[in-house]
Amino acid sequence: KLIESNAKRLNIPVTIFESDIFESVFNVEKSPCYLCARMRRGHLYSKAKELGCNKIALGHHYDDVIETILMGMLYGAQMQTMMPKLHSTNFEGMELIRPLYLIREDDIKAWRDANELKFIQCACRFTDTCSSCAEDGQSKSKRLEVKKLIAELKKTNPFVEGNIFKSVENVNLSTIV
């Protein structure tokens, strides 16, 4: 209902559909977030094709991008990023776009508040805003952990976020193993 209410307030047509993704990944211990994201994207591509669309738009923003870069390095032992636009390899003729790619999370929250909107949080137990806390009150969310690390780094380097973002564009291949 919250999504429908926001869409109505902004005069945006919306199509809501159900899936069993959360139940499918709930008991997966290794990489449930990755699996869930892949499954959600697959469902979105399928529904978009069914509706005659050739693109899906995701709400990832600048802060998501820099957190993903660090998460890949620190927890996945790889250099990776989110791209603002992708051509699907599994759904012919489909594209994924991230229109908020360069928008800061705080700016999105300010816009939300100025427009008196309410955002839903992920219904998953692994996210930083839901039931992802251990018994000692510490979050098990790697994204929240990285978000806190970035906040600490900003205390001594105000350019750290921009540097992380640019790091995947400024790769010196002659120094890579």
Locate the predicted segments by residue.
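An accessory alpha-helical subdomain
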Residues: 145-172
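Domain-wide signal for the mature, well-folded portions of proteins, strongly enriched
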Residues: 4, 13-14, 70-73, 138-144, ...
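Catalytic cores of large soluble enzymes that bind and process phosphate-bearing ligands
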Residues: 36, 138, 156
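AMP-forming adenylation/ATP pyrophosphatase catalytic core
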Residues: 39-40, 86-93, 169-177
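Catalytic subdomain that performs nucleotidyl-dependent activation
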Residues: 63-145, 149-150
